[in-house]
């Protein structure tokens, strides 16, 4: 790939140089353009009299619209997530196209990367210009923001690997008061409360409602914790489920469907985790919902070079190191910032490989939500096995009085079977609007007075 965009630092900070590309017409926001539907882009392209519109892919359409708009006197503001290539230069990839390389990517020169201390995963926003003669990509002219903050702050950040991890001590509010039909997030609050920095596994056999449960968790997080940056990562999923998730979740939804190669699954996961790490370095709270960790581990197993040592089920001995590093990145950070990862692990699929992957990940999380096939077969949702689900160090997330009531609840339902336990709890929750109201109902008449 030949890249010829070469701007010196002096040029890039020179007002006269920037004014040469200053807007005479409209400002075009590249991010908003990429969010448009293909039909809207086609209509816009036809207005600009671009030829062969129907034969162009979405990214090619965006590129053509930008180029034509600049010719007519417009200027462009762009944003994307940086991927630094081995040659030293980088490109801003877009979450709207799942960080896939395309003609509408924005080129960043090595001098800009060095000057601002940029790394893979940084979210960069700035003014961009159209490609000159002999160039293939739009180029970044001026950096306005790095990770939604002033670029100067990027100098003083501490590397993610040097940050001190702690147990989660601030609870993620998952309880939705207005949700009278679905009690899944209220049940999670009672049996396995989540905190900022949690590393949680949803252990799920097929057809137990794990994807719907993830959607409910995502909805609860965005409603109750607006300060949290939410990313939903779908690996090896069906395209219709991706569309459903994009339409139901207010957050960043990125996906690599089952018809894409394993290398694409891995590249997407690496971009997402690097982006999350850079945001945590800026003391932000990030939540990643992964569906599914098992399929991600399968993808790593496919792309990793063979070590010659193969475990049971066909898993290479070195294959699980990188997915473990992905999952292990979840942590609560001392002095601000946290990365929470809630991932689904598939079991009872009939694949020995999936069982081996689950066993490897079993002890790495600090919270587990176990879904039961027998409960789901009775069409009871959420199909959570209460006795087998729980969170480590939950005393740091809830106060002592509530914790004692949670323990009393566990003692009451322990003699019951898994189906009877969740049915009993759901019937009680139906009569109350909040979990606090539910705990009040648990009190004896003497305690209520």
Swiss-Prot record:
Its EC number is 3.6.4.-. Residues 1-17 have a biased composition (Polar residues). Keywords: ATP-binding, Helicase, Hydrolase, Nucleotide-binding, RNA-binding, Transcription, Transcription regulation, Transcription termination. It is an enzyme of class 3 (hydrolase). Pfam families: ATP-synt_ab (PF00006), Rho_N (PF07498), Rho_RNA_bind (PF07497). The keyword Transferase does not apply. Gene3D superfamilies: 1.10.720.10, Nucleic acid-binding proteins, P-loop containing nucleotide triphosphate hydrolases. Residues 1-20 are annotated as: Disordered. One of its GO terms (molecular function) is ATP binding. One of its GO terms (biological process) is DNA-templated transcription termination. InterPro entries: AAA+_ATPase, ATPase_F1/V1/A1_a/bsu_nucl-bd, CSD, NA-bd_OB-fold, P-loop_NTPase, Rho-like_N, Rho_factor_ATP-bd, Rho_N_sf. CDD domains: Rho_CSD (cd04459), rho_factor_C (cd01128). The keyword Cell inner membrane does not apply. ATP binds at residues 195-200, 207-212, 238. GO terms for cellular component: cytosol. Residues 75-150 form the Rho RNA-BD domain. Facilitates transcription termination by a mechanism that involves Rho binding to the nascent RNA, activation of Rho's RNA-dependent ATPase activity, and release of the mRNA from the DNA template. Belongs to the Rho family. Homohexamer. The homohexamer assembles into an open ring structure. PANTHER family: TRANSCRIPTION TERMINATION FACTOR RHO (PTHR46425:SF1). This is Transcription termination factor Rho.
